[in-house]
From Swiss-Prot:
Its main location: cytoplasm. Residues 26-191 form the FAD-binding PCMH-type domain. One of its GO terms (biological process) is cell division. GO terms for cellular component: cytosol. It is found in: Cytoplasm. Pfam families: FAD_binding_4, MurB_C. The gene is murB. Its EC number is 1.3.1.98. Cell wall formation. Belongs to the MurB family. It comes from Lactobacillus delbrueckii subsp. bulgaricus (strain ATCC 11842 / DSM 20081 / BCRC 10696 / JCM 1002 / NBRC 13953 / NCIMB 11778 / NCTC 12712 / WDCM 00102 / Lb 14). It catalyses: UDP-N-acetyl-alpha-D-muramate + NADP(+) = UDP-N-acetyl-3-O-(1-carboxyvinyl)-alpha-D-glucosamine + NADPH + H(+). Pathway: Cell wall biogenesis; peptidoglycan biosynthesis. This is UDP-N-acetylenolpyruvoylglucosamine reductase.
Amino acid sequence: MKLYDLKAQGLDLQENIPLSRYTFTQTGGPAEYLAFPKTLAELKELLAAAKEDQLPITVIGNASNLIIRDKGIKGLVIILTEMKEIKVEADKVHAQAGARIIDTSFAAGEAGLSGLEFAAGIPGSVGGAVFMNAGAYGGETKDCLESATVVTRDGEVKTYTNAELHFSYRHSLLQENDEIVIAATFALKAGDKATILDQMNYLNALRSYKQPLEYPSCGSVFKRPTGHFVGPMLIKAGLQGKQIGGAQVSTKHAGFIVNKGGATATDYLNLIHYIQKTIKEKDGIALQTEVRIIGEE
């Protein structure tokens, strides 16, 4: 079965859709084909159809820590945000990949379960959090993830334990293969609901105070080099406020690049490269991007 057969059967398949509608930077070129599967069965059908059509497949979640180049993405783009069910069972939380990690964290808190407080201000999806071992305020996804369920490009469903995912700083095994996170289980500890929710609300308030949430951005742009913090490095190098096109190193938090209006992905990438070049020259440090960069060059 091919993609157009699925469309004829009622699956919502869109063509030539600007991905800037979905990215947190509000930049990015078009998807040749775009689909939002609601179930694992639909996702499997899309994978099989794209394979039949010999189309490349790109899977994304909430697009919060992502830059899509201005030429867009060829083939089929699958956005998982409609696969967003969250269930709490005893001391575990089960969440589909498209669920927001914020919502998953608050579901745990409302159930009096502790361990996901750190994620209360992370805007990404559960799948994205597992994929990159997302973290904040001293916590990381690996600290409480019990297992992750994935589907291969051939439609095989597999489950990995925490240890099998080989987590490290902003990294997991899933960055090295083509498998797609479809769900995750978090093993948490019973705690005092009010205390847990207070901590989550505090971290959210801290995020609002420190981060430039008033502008579109892709979140933290660079990985933290050992022994350094990115924001202070950029300030010391005179880069805070540096702007190329509509992309600017935030004047509120130099670790963020914001869209001040009309920015393109190329503006973002040119500013990233300028920052990397400047820091390499001044400090001898090669900054690595935390943000995922995809699309046609």
